[in-house]
């Protein structure tokens, strides 16, 4: 809204403060959260007067975790806008953008510029501890909970006749995230 730049072609910035954003730009988000929205898409807009990190909202822990989850109370799935957009791909390598988005609190990383590089970057970040396994598991649980709520299968098994409690999604998360990576790695071999 409050920018003349398109994130598809460059860096979009709003100079609004957090309070100004809450008074106008965030009203639809607050209404959606109050109505039970399951997913929020994080834009690649920088907000220098609302956060001091200088990052696009989609890569900002302050914006996604502290503000969206903490202050606004959103508990659903956070999806980034397309990571191949110039606001991200002109400034970050695919692996760096993917790791930053996960550490910021994003659950789904939409369209990285190079999926294989982003995937390998996340795998390496988990293996080295740059992304905590539990952080990745939080995203898996949120996504599985959303799938269960929608009546979608949680894996290769047929969907349950009746949705079960959200605890079922938690049980579906493997002990080690590396167990999830085997089939994905096979795609790139």
Predicted segments with their positions:
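Secretory-pathway/luminal and periplasmic proteins that interact with or process carbohydrate-rich
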Residues: 3-5, 148-152
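A glycine-rich phosphate-binding loop feature that marks nucleotide/adenosyl-phosphate handling sites
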Residues: 119, 140, 158-161
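C-terminal cell-surface addressing/anchoring modules of secreted/extracellular proteins
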Residues: 162-189
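Flexible, glycine/charged-enriched surface loops at secondary-structure junctions
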Residues: 129-138, 152-157
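Caspase-like cysteine protease fold
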Residues: 150, 161-162
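Short amphipathic alpha-helical coiled-coil/interface segments
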Residues: 140-147
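Compositionally biased amphipathic helical and low-complexity segments enriched in hydrophobic
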Residues: 27, 103, 145, 153-155, ...
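Second-shell residues forming the walls of enzyme active-site clefts
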Residues: 1-124, 130-135, 142
């Amino acid at each position: 809204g409050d920018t003349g730049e398109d994130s598809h072609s460059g860096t979009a910035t709003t100079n609004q403060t957090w309070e100004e954003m809450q008074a106008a730009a965030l009203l639809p988000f607050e209404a959606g959260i109050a109505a039970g929205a399951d997913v929020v898409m994080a834009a690649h807009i920088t907000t220098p007067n609302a956060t001091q990190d200088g990052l696009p909202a989609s890569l900002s822990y302050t914006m996604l975790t502290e503000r969206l989850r903490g202050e606004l109370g959103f508990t659903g799935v956070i999806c980034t806008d397309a990571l191949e957009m110039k606001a991200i791909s002109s400034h970050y390598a695919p692996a760096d953008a993917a790791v930053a988005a996960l550490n910021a609190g994003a659950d789904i990383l939409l369209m990285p510029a190079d999926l294989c590089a982003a995937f390998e970057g996340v795998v390496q970040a988990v293996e080295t501890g740059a992304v905590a396994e539990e952080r990745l598991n939080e995203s898996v649980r949120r996504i599985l909970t959303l799938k269960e709520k929608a009546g979608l299968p949680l894996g290769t098994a047929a969907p349950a006749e009746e949705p079960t409690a959200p605890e079922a999604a938690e049980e579906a998360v493997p002990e080690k995230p590396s167990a999830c990576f085997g089939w994905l790695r096979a795609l790139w071999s």
